[in-house]
């Protein structure tokens, strides 16, 4: 019983962890930032990058993916930012606040200068254009030449797996799975309780039946005892009639029947 509840609890925790994702950090211009921040400031919420960029002609071509977290696709010196809904409903760029991530010994460092030089020489012109922003300003033309290399270092993540927003359907499925697991656990408890009660009732009825049979069969056992068997008595009748015997010599009585001697 306890094992069933432990399994249900572990599965629920895994579903919640999959729905909300685990937090991580990413590098940007030599700093670590939290990877799962969805609010640039208190009271504001980031819009989905694909939805916001679809309505803007000046949005960065590279983008940041299908999510609503703070990123820096155009290498803004102020750090990561995101789109928020403006007064007229038009997406507006807003820098993210309180986004710093504490460094740990297990975090990877940015690419070295040697790797940057090799990366700048390796890819061709077509590959460089994939990382270069389309709306780079003329004043930043010199910095735009190294932006493709910075874009490569920016993709160094603490988590190799990019988090995805499951959306409302994912949350609904997670809650449904939790409800099903709880229902299964409750069903197991009820089934066990019912079966246990039924077994106890059958044992009680069997004991009552055995006591009743003992009470009924006890008087009959007395008659099966050999010492208590009843024997039929036989009446013996003795008759007093005598068989006539012939008289012999010497056997004549000295006195007759009439009582006269010598008769």
From Swiss-Prot:
Assigned keywords, A-Z:
Cell membrane, Disulfide bond, Glycoprotein, Kringle, Membrane, Signal, Transmembrane, Transmembrane helix
Biased composition annotated in UniProt, kind: Polar residues? 242-251
Q: Which residues lie on this side of the membrane: Cytoplasmic?
A: 190-263
Question: What are the cysteine partners in each disulfide bond?
Answer: 25-101, 46-82, 70-96
Question: Which residues lie within the region annotated Disordered?
Answer: 242-263
Q: Which Pfam families match?
A: Kringle
Output one GO MF annotation.
Answer: phosphatidylinositol 3-kinase inhibitor activity
InterPro entries membership: Kringle, Kringle-like, Kringle_CS, Kringle_sf
Transmembrane spans:
169-189
| Location(s) in or outside the cell | Cell membrane
Which SUPFAM superfamilies would you find in this protein's record? Answer: Kringle-like
- What topology in the membrane does the UniProt record assign? Single-pass type I membrane protein
Q: What is its main location?
A: membrane
List the GO terms this entry assigns under cellular component, sorted alphabetically.
plasma membrane
Q: Which residues form the signal peptide?
A: 1-21
CDD domains of this UniProt entry? KR
Q: What does this protein do?
A: Negative regulator of hepatic phosphatidylinositol 3-kinase (PI3K) activity.
Indicate what this protein is called per its UniProt record.
Phosphoinositide-3-kinase-interacting protein 1
């Amino acid at each position: 019983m306890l094992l069933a509840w432990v399994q249900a609890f572990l599965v629920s925790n895994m579903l919640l962890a999959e729905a909300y994702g685990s937090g991580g950090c990413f590098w940007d211009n030599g700093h670590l930032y939290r990877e799962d921040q969805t609010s640039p400031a208190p009271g504001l919420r980031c819009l989905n990058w694909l939805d916001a960029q679809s309505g803007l002609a000046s949005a960065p071509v590279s983008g940041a993916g299908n999510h609503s977290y703070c990123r820096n696709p155009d290498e803004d010196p102020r750090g990561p930012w995101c789109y928020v809904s403006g007064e007229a409903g038009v997406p507006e760029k807003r820098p993210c606040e309180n986004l710093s991530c504490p460094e740990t010994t297990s975090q990877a460092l940015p690419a070295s200068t040697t790797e940057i030089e090799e990366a700048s020489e390796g890819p061709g012109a077509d590959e460089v254009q994939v990382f270069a922003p389309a709306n780079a300003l003329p004043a930043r033309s010199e910095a735009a030449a190294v932006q493709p290399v910075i874009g490569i270092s920016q993709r160094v993540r603490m988590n190799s797996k990019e988090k995805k927003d499951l959306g409302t359907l994912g949350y609904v499925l997670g809650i449904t799975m939790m409800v099903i697991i709880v229902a299964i656990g409750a069903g197991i408890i009820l089934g066990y309780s019912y079966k246990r009660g039924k077994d106890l009732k059958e044992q009680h009825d069997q004991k009552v039946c055995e006591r009743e049979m003992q009470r009924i069969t006890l008087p009959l056992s007395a008659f099966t005892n050999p010492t208590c068997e009843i024997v039929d008595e036989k009446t013996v009748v003795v008759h007093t009639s005598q068989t006539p015997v012939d008289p012999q010599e010497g056997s004549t009585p000295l006195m007759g029947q009439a009582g006269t001697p010598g008769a």
